[in-house]
Amino acid sequence: MKKKILIVSGGISKERIISIDTGKQVAKELRKNGYLVKICEPDKNFLSITKNFKPHIIFNALHGQFGEDGYIQSILEIIGIPYTHSGVISSAKAMDKEISKRIFKKNKILTPKYFLYTFNKTDKKLISEINKKLGFPVVIKPINEGSSVNVFICTRRNIFSKLKLLKDYKKVLIEQFIPGREIQAAIIGKKKLGAIELKPKRKFYDYQAKYNSKAKTEHIIPVDLKKNDYNKLMDIALKAHRLIECRGVTRSDFKFYNGKFYLLEINTQPGMTSLSLVPEIAAY
């Protein structure tokens, strides 16, 4: 009897299109390998589809809010069907950038300096705090989005216009900007899968650089690092994976500057599209 796998993809987050693409790519590969596959949305029909299809496992192909923040994982725990990727608590910890950065700092993993901003300071006080704690330029980002959605590099001149775009989030992370090389490392289970370097033509590896085929981001694999540096990179990625208590696959995003690796964040639901990095690392 063929094993049945239900892929849940789409959803209502800003990464819906990426999730749909991930679901299609995963379904294609699973069918090639002899599995009986069905794709569904996490909507009002989800529970009845699950009940009728009776999958052996659910492949979580959702990205962003409600897909990698512990929400869908909670539902899957309640209905008692095994599912892929990280569980409820680990997903929530990884998705909340402020919580995950606190865990990194506590465990001596280097991460850019930051503070949480809740839109309750005057312009003058905010500028003063940034100058004192971080210095310009800075990176501003929602604490609970993925795929670099609404992430901006800001100078003193444009920070307030960019913050206005994020006001609906209520709180955002203001983070020290680290120049240098963009390197991402993948872990699967307890295995160090590998790493890839990115050279975007844009200012940084944002949403467009990730998913627009015309953005022409250069992917470099193998990464040009000394053996000791490469081993250090993969050790940090595995340490972060374990600290957040992840399972399955994760991708950790780093900046490499002045001989040091700065961990930006860990992703528990890395994309599996034709432009995604983990499949490229795995295929190498």
Task: Label each region the model flagged.
Residues 31, 77, 105, 132-134, ...:
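Anion (oxyanion) recognition and catalysis
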Residues 155-232, 255-262:
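Phosphate-binding site of ATP-dependent enzymes
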Residues 176, 185, 241-274, 282:
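Conserved metal-phosphate-binding beta-hairpin within the catalytic cores
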Residues 203-207, 272-281:
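A short, polar/charged loop-to-alpha-helix boundary motif
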Residues 22, 233-236:
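Hydrophobic alpha-helical membrane-association signature
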Residues 1-89, 93-95, 99, 118-126:
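ATP-binding N-terminal substructure of ATP-dependent carboxylate-amine bond-forming enzymes
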Residues 1-9, 37, 52, 93-181:
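Active-site nucleotide/adenylate-binding loops and adjacent lid/helix of ATP-dependent enzymes
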